[in-house]
């Protein structure tokens, strides 16, 4: 487990005070740098030792066959796996003839710092070689947010006590060996030498390697160039082979003298451009980097982040761990999306190979809601990527004998890659999640151009899918059969409430969008009768309810399923230890499902229903998913269980920083990082937007004395400063200087010329705090020794 002792709690940085080789893979994920196009895991500069080497380009993947013991019609035949591309991070240091390696000699001091304001990873090390030569190494690494194709490293070596001869080998390396993986289905498949050499060249102070994948036929280029500063004589040479380019720097240093190397990196890939064009793209990016210079890249990085934090920062007084974690989460969300530019946002971002680098519903359901309020330009690009896969989704629906478009459950390029139908294709709700993301973007930003450009087509085709999936019974009630909701322990069911409510919302949203754009809708074949059918299905959707218990059923009949014996089954995650034949017919819930419906479709439930539903389902949720704690935090806060909500918020925020789910080594959990923001802003800030108006209803737990968050809404920048007694709204920018929001259920008009302070509404719980399954209580702020072993 990652501890506070090694990673102290600090508001604007993640600092590792000592190097623990047993936690190397986890720290590589925490210290990953990315801009949404390039991703560099936080591997040590010298390349070894490593937990999981990793350099990624968004959507650069290889195809592999999906094995089936017994295949069936409509099963995907091929999977897609992100490729560990050419590694440009490596700078191998030799002191005299001895390699700098933290496993040998003496590491006198070692520290790494991820600076959330500067956007850099800095490493400081004092090392004494086995021959008693001491050097100080300081490296600073960045992946540029301002320049999409550029990364850079400043590497400084200082002699401390004796004259030393120093050699640095700066490399580009392709087809690195990958460590063996476990049988955990969340771990990536291993690709054996996925890159085929196309071209290699050496320049005066750098080199360039070009490769292509064998099956997906994607081509990539990686280039490097160097600036070298050193007193006295220096020798610089470069050589290149198909899988290796190396620039070697040799010099002598007296005590106090320094060798400074700035390594510029450029990456690009394409499925369409020619080899010369891709070569020239990488070369041009290197020239751009050298023109900017190291200081110019640093300044541009900080300026980009200053602008982001001005509209996105969250301040948490009284809970320093959550303070650090929410900023860490926002930083990585920005890194995953800032320059993705019409590529997917994978569930691990570009921090590791977990889930093969696939994007799921996590993107539209958990990540994009946060970015819509903090970095809307990135959301527009992510939605354009999803829309670019619409034809593939239509082809998939046709293959399955359905109308409209069926977006895939997991993918890189847009084709379905899930080999398990019950927790893949049957999770049809992803189509409504995507539709909701388009509608939220329109509502929050006030920008209709994205809907006009591509969103309308997505809304129409997903609505057509729902109409062909569902049916009216003889009583006129509309049903969805054979569906799986967010809870993957209750699969292929009738009338999952979450799915039915989301589908109904999708249908109504599509009909409303067609009214806003009648000519475009007509051109897509939409008729008045079709829109009426959408609305009729939405109005008639079955929402199962148990009158005897006074709770909604997660799906038809759920409250009559067999109760799960939590006392007898205590090894988690259950999907690694229990057969699905036991899980599916029982009242055991992997993650928030009905409870998530109450968050995303809040208006569909009364306060009393929410309170009773939370009480019932809390006792059955085991959180074998990192997507659950944030939702439970939001809904526990809404029904008045503020201290329990704070524990869930703490767990959601610390999943990666404390490696609570034991799989941070495979990459960070983007949705849970987003969940830290959602738990605080949606839970204790009371933010809702499902009725088309910005609704805020703050209420803080005892452990938080002040919650101050910033967000964007229709051109305005709004700061919400909540305390236990009152909340102050400060409006900046925006059209007209006035904005009407809903505060605690009442309309409130804010003006940009003066802040508005108003009392908060006290939340009194209708029921006592619910219990959880034995051993599945949230990781508590007050009992940090509790550790869960859960799954995504």
From Swiss-Prot:
Belongs to the glycosyl hydrolase 65 family. This is Uncharacterized glycosyl hydrolase ML0392. Residues 766-776 have a biased composition (Pro residues). Substrate binds at residues 361-362, 590-591. Coiled coil: none annotated. GO terms for molecular function: carbohydrate binding; glycosyltransferase activity; hydrolase activity, hydrolyzing O-glycosyl compounds. InterPro entries: 6-hairpin_glycosidase_sf, 6hp_glycosidase-like_sf, Gal_mutarotase_sf_dom, Glyco_hydro_65_C, Glyco_hydro_65_M, Glyco_hydro_65_N, Glyco_hydro_65_N_sf, Malt_Pase/Glycosyl_Hdrlase. The keyword Ion transport does not apply. Its EC number is 3.2.1.-. Keywords: Glycosidase, Hydrolase. It comes from the Bacteria. The keyword Calcium does not apply. PANTHER family: GLYCOSYL HYDROLASE-RELATED, GLYCOSYL TRANSFERASE. It holds the Pfam family Glyco_hydro_65C. GO terms for biological process: carbohydrate metabolic process. Residues 753-792 are annotated as: Disordered.
């Amino acid at each position: 487990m990652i501890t506070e002792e090694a990673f102290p709690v600090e508001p604007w940085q993640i600092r590792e005070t000592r190097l623990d080789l047993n936690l190397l893979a986890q720290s590589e994920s925490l210290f990953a740098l990315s801009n949404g196009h390039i991703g560099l895991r936080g591997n040590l500069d010298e390349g070894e030792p490593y937990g999981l080497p990793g350099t990624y380009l968004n959507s650069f993947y290889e195809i592999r066959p999906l094995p089936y013991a017994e295949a069936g019609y409509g099963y995907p035949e091929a999977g897609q796996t992100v490729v560990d591309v050419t590694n440009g991070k490596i700078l191998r240091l030799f002191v005299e003839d001895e390699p700098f390696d933290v496993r040998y000699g003496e590491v006198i001091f070692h520290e790494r710092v991820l600076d959330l304001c500067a956007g850099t990873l800095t490493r400081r090390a004092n090392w004494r070689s086995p021959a008693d030569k001491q050097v100080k190494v300081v490296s600073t690494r960045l992946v540029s947010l301002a320049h999409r194709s550029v990364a850079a490293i400043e590497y400084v070596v200082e002699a401390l006590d004796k004259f030393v001869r120093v050699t640095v080998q700066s490399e580009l390396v392709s087809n690195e060996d990958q460590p063996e993986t476990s049988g955990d289905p969340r771990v990536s498949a291993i690709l054996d030498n996925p890159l085929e050499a196309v071209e290699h060249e050496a320049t005066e102070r750098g080199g360039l390697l070009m490769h292509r994948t064998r099956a997906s036929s994607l081509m990539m280029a990686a280039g490097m160039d160097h600036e070298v500063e050193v007193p006295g004589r220096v020798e610089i040479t470069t050589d290149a082979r198909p899988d290796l380019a190396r620039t070697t720097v040799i010099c002598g240093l007296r005590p106090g003298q320094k060798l400074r190397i700035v390594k510029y990196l450029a990456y690009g890939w394409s499925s369409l451009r020619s080899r010369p064009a891709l070569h020239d793209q990488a070369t041009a990016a290197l020239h751009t980097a050298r023109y900017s210079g190291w200081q110019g890249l640093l300044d541009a990085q900080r300026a980009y982040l200053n602008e982001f934090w001005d509209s996105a920062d969250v301040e948490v007084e009284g809970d320093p761990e959550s303070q650090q974690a929410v900023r860490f989460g926002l930083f990585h969300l920005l890194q995953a999306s800032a320059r993705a530019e019409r590529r997917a946002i994978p569930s691990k971002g570009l921090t590791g190979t977990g889930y093969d680098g696939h994007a799921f519903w996590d993107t539209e359901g958990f990540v994009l809601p946060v970015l819509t309020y903090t970095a809307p330009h990135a959301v527009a690009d992510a939605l354009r990527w999803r829309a670019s896969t619409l034809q593939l989704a239509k082809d998939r629906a046709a293959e399955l004998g359905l109308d409209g478009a069926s977006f895939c459950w997991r993918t890189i390029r847009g084709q379905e890659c899930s080999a398990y139908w019950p927790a893949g294709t049957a999770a049809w709700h992803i189509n409504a999640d995507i539709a909701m993301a388009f509608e939220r973007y329109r509502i929050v930003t006030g920008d209709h151009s994205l809907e006009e450009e591509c969103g309308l087509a997505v809304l129409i085709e997903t609505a057509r899918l729902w109409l062909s999936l569902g049916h009216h019974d003889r009583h006129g009630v509309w049903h969805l059969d054979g569906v799986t909701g967010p809870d993957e322990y209750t699969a292929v069911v009738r009338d999952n409430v979450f799915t039915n409510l989301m589908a109904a919302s999708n249908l109504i949203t599509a009909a409303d969008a067609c009214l806003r754009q009648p000519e475009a809708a007509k051109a897509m074949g939409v008729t008045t009768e079709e829109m009426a059918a959408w609305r009729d299905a939405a109005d008639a959707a079955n929402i199962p309810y148990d009158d005897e218990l006074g709770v909604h059923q997660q799906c038809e009949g759920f409250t009559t399923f067999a109760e799960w014996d939590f006392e007898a089954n205590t090894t988690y995650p259950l999907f690694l230890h229990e057969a699905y034949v036991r899980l599916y017919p029982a009242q055991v819930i992997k993650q928030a499902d009905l409870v998530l419906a109450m968050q995303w479709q809040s208006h569909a439930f009364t306060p009393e229903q929410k309170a009773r539903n939370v009480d019932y389902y809390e006792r059955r949720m085991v959180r074998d998913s990192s997507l659950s704690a944030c939702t439970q935090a939001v809904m526990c806060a809404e029904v008045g269980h503020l201290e329990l909500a704070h524990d869930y918020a703490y767990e959601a925020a610390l999943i990666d920083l404390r490696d609570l789910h034991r799989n941070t080594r495979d990459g960070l959990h983007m949705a849970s990082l987003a969940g830290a923001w959602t738990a605080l802003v949606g839970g204790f800030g009371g933010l809702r937007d499902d009725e088309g108006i910005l609704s805020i209803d703050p209420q803080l737990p005892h452990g938080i004395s002040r919650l101050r968050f910033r967000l964007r809404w229709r051109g305005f920048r709004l700061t919400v400063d909540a305390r236990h007694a009152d909340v102050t709204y400060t409006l900046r920018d925006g059209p007209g200087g006035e904005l009407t929001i809903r505060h605690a259920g009442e309309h409130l008009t804010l003006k940009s010329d003066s802040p508005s302070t108003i009392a908060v509404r006290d939340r009194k719980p209708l029921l006592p705090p619910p219990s959880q399954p034995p051993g599945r209580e949230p990781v508590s702020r007050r009992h940090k020794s509790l550790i869960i072993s859960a799954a995504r």
